Amino acid sequence: METAPLEAIVKAYGTPCFVFDEAALARRMHAVREIVGERMRLCYSVKANPFLIPAMCGLVETLEVCSPGELEICMALGVRPDAILFSGVNKTWRDVERAMDAGVTRFTCESPLHVRLIDEAAQSRGRVYPVLLRLTAGSQFGMDEADLLAAVA
């Protein structure tokens, strides 16, 4: 970034303000893509910074949302529902239904409750939705081995 444009931004918006170099972001994301190739899909977690959603849409295949608010922001910005992964440990029946109604087709399951919520909502629509089961590594998030095995049984 050049000093002159930054000075103009400070005059226009004051301080503090956040300024992102989208060209630098794109270069870094392309470097990551070169390293991982096409064998992996890149995912941006919206909670990191929702203001970067428009820039990230062209750089990653998936946007992870963890709340109804993040989902609404993505919908308002025109993010394709098939590019959204609905995640989060506090999902409710209403959240899952809203996401499905919006066209979201991929979900994470962090608990046996999430498995039931998503399964019941899918069945009520006569659909099958792919899910990612989150296995805990000893933290408070995710399912332990027994819960995970029960989920796939």
Question: Which ranges hold each PLM region?
Answer:
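A charged N-terminal "starter" segment
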Residues: 1-129, 133, 137, 149
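Active-site loop/helix belt of alpha/beta enzymes
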Residues: 137-153
